[in-house]
UniProtKB/Swiss-Prot annotation:
Name this protein carries in UniProt: Glutaminase
Keywords assigned by UniProt, alphabetized: Hydrolase
Family (UniProt): Belongs to the glutaminase family.
InterPro entries found in the cross-reference section: Beta-lactam/transpept-like (IPR012338), Glutaminase (IPR015868)
Self-association state and partner proteins as the record states: Homotetramer.
Record GO terms (molecular function): glutaminase activity
C-alpha cells in the first residue's frame, strides 16, 4: 500500500465526512427503513490476508438492500451455466433508475444487468428453479462467507417491502409477459425482499465480500467461492452498474468496483488487497449513501488506490 492502514486513518476520514450528515435523505418509500437514525456512520476493511480495520458504527447491523444482488448473482453462478444466466439478463449499465419499467418494455423483458431491480428479480426467479429453500440457502451462503452464524433477515423490513411492492410486482409481471419470468411472482418477490432485508454490519460485509478482492477465494474458507474469471466478471459489473445511474460519477470520484443499497451501505473492492464497507443511511438523489461515497473517495485518495 502507498500508506500503511490503521484505524486512525479511518477515524480521520469519518471526521472529515461527518459534516455531510443532514444533507441527504434516509429512504422513506420503505416505511421500515424510514425510522433508521440518519446520523449513523461506519466503515470497515477486511484485507485478503484477514486483517481487519474499522471506525465509527462499523459493528452495527443494518439492512443491506441492493448489496444483496451481488450475493444472489454469486449463488446463481454456482448453480447455472454461464450462458443460461446471460441469455436472461444483460451485462450493460442501464443509465436509468434502478426500478425503471420503460427500458424493460423497450427491450422486451430482458433487464440490462443483474444489479437493477428487474435483473435481480430474474436472478431470484432462476434461484427459485434450482434451490429447494432459496431463503435458507442464502442464509447458509452468507453465514459461511462472513464466518458469523447468526446473520439473519429483518422480517419487519421484508414484510414492509412486500406490502409496498407494487412497482417490483409490475416489473416481474412485465417480464413474465415477455417469457422471461418462470415462477410464481409473489413467491419470488418474497425471496427477493428477504435477501434485501439481510441485516449485516460493515465489518461483516467486508469479510463477506473479500473473496472478490482475491480472485474468488476467501482467506477463511477451504473452497473458492467463485472462479477467478467469475470474480473478475462480478467486479466488472459492479464497476459499470453497481451504483445505479451514478456509476460513472462514482468511477470518476472513487475508482473502485462497488455496490450500494438504499439502506445506506456500500461495498467496494480493491483487487488483490481488500474489501471495504461503509454505511451512512442518508442518500443522494440516486439512492446512494452521500457520506459513504465521500468516505470512499477520501480513502482511495489517502491510500492512492484506483482500478483506473
Amino acid at each position: 500500500m502507498a500508506r500503511a492502514m490503521d484505524n486512525a486513518i479511518l477515524e480521520t476520514i469519518l471526521q472529515r465526512v461527518r459534516p455531510l450528515i443532514g444533507q441527504g435523505k434516509v429512504a422513506d418509500y420503505i416505511p421500515a427503513l424510514a425510522s433508521v437514525e440518519g446520523s449513523k456512520l461506519g466503515i470497515a476493511i477486511c484485507t485478503v490476508d484477514g486483517q481487519h480495520y474499522q471506525a465509527g458504527d462499523a459493528h452495527e447491523r443494518f439492512s443491506i438492500q441492493s448489496i444483496s444482488k451481488v450475493l444472489s448473482l454469486v449463488v446463481a453462478m454456482r448453480h447455472y451455466p454461464e450462458e443460461e444466466i446471460w441469455q436472461r439478463v444483460g451485462k450493460d449499465p442501464s443509465g436509468s433508475p434502478f426500478n425503471s419499467l420503460v427500458q424493460l418494455e423497450m427491450e422486451q423483458g430482458i433487464p440490462r444487468n443483474p444489479f437493477i431491480n428487474a435483473g435481480a428479480l430474474v436472478v431470484c426467479d432462476m434461484l427459485q428453479g434450482r434451490l429447494s429453500a432459496p431463503r435458507q440457502r442464502m442464509l447458509e451462503v452468507v453465514r459461511a462467507l462472513c464466518g458469523v452464524s447468526d446473520i439473519t433477515y429483518d422480517v419487519t423490513v421484508a414484510r414492509s417491502e412486500f406490502e409496498h411492492s407494487a412497482r417490483n410486482a409490475a416489473i416481474a409481471w412485465l417480464m413474465k409477459s415477455f417469457g422471461n419470468f418462470h415462477h410464481d411472482v409473489p413467491t419470488v418477490l418474497q425471496n427477493y425482499f428477504h435477501y434485501c432485508a439481510l441485516k449485516m454490519s460493515c465489518m461483516e460485509l467486508a469479510r463477506t465480500f473479500v473473496f472478490l478482492a482475491n480472485q474468488g477465494e476467501a482467506f477463511h474458507l477451504d473452497e473458492p467461492v467463485v472462479t477467478p474469471m467469475q470474480a473478475r466478471q462480478i467486479n466488472a459489473l459492479m464497476a459499470t452498474s453497481g451504483m445505479y445511474q451514478n456509476a460513472g460519477e462514482f468511477a470518476w470520484r472513487v475508482g473502485l468496483p462497488a455496490k450500494s443499497g438504499v439502506g445506506g451501505g456500500i461495498v467496494a473492492i480493491v483487487p488483490h488487497e481488500m474489501a471495504i464497507a461503509v454505511w451512512s443511511p442518508e442518500l443522494d438523489p440516486a439512492g446512494n449513501s452521500l457520506a459513504g461515497i465521500a468516505a470512499l473517495e477520501q480513502l482511495t485518495q489517502t491510500l492512492g488506490r484506483s482500478v483506473y
